[in-house]
Amino acid sequence: MAESRMNLMTAKEAARYLRVSMFTLSKIERVGGLVPYRTPGGHRRYSLRMLNRYLNNSRR
């Protein structure tokens, strides 16, 4: 994982950043729109770069 831990967001933070619900965030993941990093405990983490890339691609 090359991203700095300071640039990683939790699922809740990522959903808020994207202005979607947690359910919608999960749907985006299921269809391959986002592939989050996983912590050793299995928690999802999203980089700001990943989220911005998704936003830019979804606007096209």
Regions found by a protein language model. Give the residues of each.
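Polyanion-binding surface elements
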Residues: 1-27
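Structural detector for helix-capping/boundary residues
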Residues: 12, 48-49
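A short, Lys/Arg-enriched interface patch at domain edges and termini
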Residues: 49-60
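Major-groove DNA-recognition helix of helix-turn-helix-type DNA-binding domains
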Residues: 18-45
